[in-house]
């Protein structure tokens, strides 16, 4: 009788685990075309200029998990991630990369936009062999935060943006050494905001803000989980 009871208990446990695994899988969503939306309580954004790329959104690890794969040819660009809309200048973000394989040119960054002024910003924590932002950037010193040093850059751009097409400015903080994978990391965004402001680089009204994977002219993949530590 005891063995029969144990067998029933094990059987129920297996069925329960299968149910939760199935429910978790049912929350998965694959995106391969330009769009924004919500998934498991997080805002997401996916942009692809050319080439091939997809993002899979899941409910794993509190809902902030996503993975990407990309093959972008020589000039394709992909920006994909999960986060918040609107973002916040004081947000403290946690994240963990189960995988970040950027190929020849890819970044892992806290990424977003503001309007009035129209600004695209990056806090790059890891990147591939190519170090962003590349030519034409104005170097404006450094900021030390979250256990590392970041180089600050400002770039004037013109092209597609969240308001259409036209001029905008990029603000960059690029960490001098890549973050470790498979561990919990923190980005204290306000430390970058204050450092940028000291160089006259002010943000306006916050638009979306994501923990992003970007690939440019490369092949790669990522698996990222993000969460909010404080707003």
Task: Please describe what each predicted stretch is.
Residues 29-81:
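N-terminal segment immediately downstream of the Sec signal-peptide cleavage site
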Residues 2-11:
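Bacterial N-terminal signal peptides that target proteins for export
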Residues 97-104, 113-116, 177, 210-221:
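Short, flexible beta-strand-to-coil junctions
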């Amino acid at each position: 009788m005891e063995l029969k009871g144990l067998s029933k208990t094990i059987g129920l446990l297996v069925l329960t685990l299968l149910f939760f695994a199935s429910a978790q899988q049912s929350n998965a969503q694959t995106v391969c075309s330009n769009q924004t939306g919500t998934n498991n309580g997080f805002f997401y954004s996916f942009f692809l200029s050319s080439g091939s790329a997809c993002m899979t959104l899941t409910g794993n690890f509190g809902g902030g998990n996503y993975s990407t794969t990309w093959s972008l040819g020589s000039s394709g660009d992909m920006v994909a991630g999960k986060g918040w809309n609107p973002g916040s200048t004081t947000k403290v973000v946690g994240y963990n990369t189960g995988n970040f394989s950027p190929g020849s040119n890819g970044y892992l960054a806290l990424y977003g936009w503001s309007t009035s002024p129209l600004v695209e910003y990056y806090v790059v924590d890891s990147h591939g062999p190519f170090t962003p932002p590349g030519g034409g950037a104005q170097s404006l010193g450094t900021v030390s935060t979250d256990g590392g040093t970041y180089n600050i850059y400002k770039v004037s751009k013109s092209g597609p943006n969240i308001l259409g097409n036209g001029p905008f400015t990029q603000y960059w903080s690029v960490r001098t050494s890549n973050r470790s994978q498979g561990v919990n990391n923190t980005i204290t965004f306000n430390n970058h905001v204050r450092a940028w402001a000291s160089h006259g680089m002010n943000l306006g009204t916050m638009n979306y803000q994501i923990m992003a994977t970007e690939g440019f002219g490369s092949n790669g993949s990522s698996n990222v989980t993000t969460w909010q530590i404080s707003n």
